[in-house]
């Protein structure tokens, strides 16, 4: 069953936390969920050069807090916090509320080579630039294991090398037990555009076992976040 379900979803409440953390009544739930999707889309576009892996959102009726997980915190913060102001304005524009209190917490990724989202994105970008799909997968695996990953699995699907028949090729190094729920498996999917069509890239990275029943939130697995409120440092 571990092969059929997203490892991220399968581990919610065990070793992973939800990306959206708030409570809303029925009439408000759909509105906030739609806003969260639009906020992430806008911010990933705004911060496309900042190597952003994940954006978590916490809400109350009066304020909204963003947890931006990135390998380049300096780019997200900007000179004298100018990019934070842009992020706050983008969020307020998306939710159509100029008075909303927006808090931004930037969390630095210590090992970007062991982050599934960044690894999948890097493999996809290299394939889009006509690099060998076999070479980039092997290089990504080597870097991930060197960065401390217990195991990594990669797979690319589509018209690989421009051939007529679509196929899937991948590699596995180390241990990646998808059905062991106490294993913190990081999973990501990326679609790489090429002249022959879309190439799907999947990455699974095993960060080891978590024996205590605790949610892996940002404060537990990352360094102390940097906080900015209302667009000011």
UniProtKB/Swiss-Prot annotation:
UniProt KW keywords: Ribonucleoprotein, Ribosomal protein, RNA-binding, rRNA-binding
PANTHER family, alphabetized: 30S/40S RIBOSOMAL PROTEIN S3, SMALL RIBOSOMAL SUBUNIT PROTEIN US3C
Domain KH type-2: 39-108
Pfam families listed in its UniProt record: KH_2 (PF07650), Ribosomal_S3_C (PF00189)
PROSITE patterns in alphabetical order: KH_TYPE_2, RIBOSOMAL_S3
GO MF entries: mRNA binding; rRNA binding; structural constituent of ribosome
Family listed: Belongs to the universal ribosomal protein uS3 family.
Protein role: Binds the lower part of the 30S subunit head. Binds mRNA in the 70S ribosome, positioning it for translation.
Organism: Mycoplasma capricolum subsp. capricolum (strain California kid / ATCC 27343 / NCTC 10154)
GO cellular component, one term: cytosolic small ribosomal subunit
SUPFAM superfamilies reported in the protein's UniProt record: Prokaryotic type KH domain (KH-domain type II), Ribosomal protein S3 C-terminal domain
GO BP, one annotated term: translation
Protein name: Small ribosomal subunit protein uS3
Subunit relationships: Part of the 30S ribosomal subunit. Forms a tight complex with proteins S10 and S14.
């Amino acid at each position: 069953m571990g092969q059929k379900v997203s490892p991220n979803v399968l581990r919610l409440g065990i070793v992973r936390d939800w990306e959206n953390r708030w409570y809303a009544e029925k009439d408000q739930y759909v509105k906030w969920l739609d806003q969260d999707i639009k906020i992430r889309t806008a911010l990933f576009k705004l911060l496309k050069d900042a190597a952003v892996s994940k954006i978590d959102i916490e809400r109350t009726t009066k304020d909204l807090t963003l947890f931006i997980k990135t390998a380049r915190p300096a780019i997200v913060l900007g000179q004298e916090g100018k990019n934070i102001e842009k992020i706050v304005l983008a969020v307020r524009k998306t939710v159509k509320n100029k008075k909303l209190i927006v808090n931004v917490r930037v969390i630095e990724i210590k090992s970007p080579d062991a982050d599934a989202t960044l690894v999948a994105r890097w493999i996809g970008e290299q394939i889009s630039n006509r690099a060998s799909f076999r070479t980039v997968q092997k290089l990504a695996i080597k870097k991930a294991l060197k960065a401390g990953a217990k195991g990594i699995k990669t797979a690319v699907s589509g018209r690989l090398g421009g051939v007529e028949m679509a196929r899937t090729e991948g590699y596995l190094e180390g241990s990646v037990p998808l059905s062991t729920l106490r294993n913190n498996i990081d999973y990501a999917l990326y679609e790489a555009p090429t002249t022959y069509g879309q190439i799907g890239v999947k990455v699974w990275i095993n960060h080891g076992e978590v024996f205590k029943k605790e949610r892996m939130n940002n404060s537990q697995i990352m360094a102390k976040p940097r906080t900015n409120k209302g667009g000011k440092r």
